[in-house]
Amino acid sequence: MKKLFREIAISVFLFFGILFATLQVDWLKVLHLTPTIIGDKLSELVWDFISSGLYEVDSEKVCLPIDTLVHEMCIANGIDTASVSIVVARTYEVNAFATVGNHLVVNTGLISEMDNETQLSAALGHEMAHIQLGHIQKSIRQNAALQAILILVTGNSRSNNIRKITEKLISSGITRAKEREADESGARYIDAMHLDAKEMAIMFEKFKDDNSLSYFKDHDNNQKRAAHIREMHFTSKEPYRQILSPETWEAMQEVCR
């Protein structure tokens, strides 16, 4: 029995030792791969992995308003509309996230919690900024070995837990400095849309004490984020735009609730 435990302990030690050593190697240099090659290939695998666990919403009452807000954001900020792919996922989890392949996933749970189109645009703008600033691709490169190992080990597994681990691996490369950078860029995006960028601060303050909500739990202190946004200078003044009609907004909210 002792021999068996010793063999198991040695095997576990060797496994994690090899895994740790693997993560210390810059495989891009060793294998003479460019970031584009490894990023594109791994992105395809990871997105297939993540998207398989999403229940995608196809209701026009939801998708069209979201597409409209993103389109207006892109036009106002000189962003190629083809550079981002929007996916609306049916789940009560209050969350939105940018992920591989320039995909931006927004949950119906987040949409239903927003007070108005500007707050929703602020959440979309923050995630759009992660994509435009290259944060996601950098994170993919940093965790390439571990993500590849996870996919190989789990094979065709499509469990929700494995999907969440994969998402966490991507978000783990997003530092607080990058989060602040995304906040700032996201606020400027909605300011350029002639929306009230201070609504981003109001959104943070609204959820400052609710750590159960995934979107706000995974980010930096919301009170500090709100204060930082309020300190920023914005050019748009009242009266602000209204992009979606009240009827369109309410219809979208009704489907998402």
Name the predicted role of every residue range.
Residues M1-R257:
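A Zn2+-metalloprotease active-site environment signal
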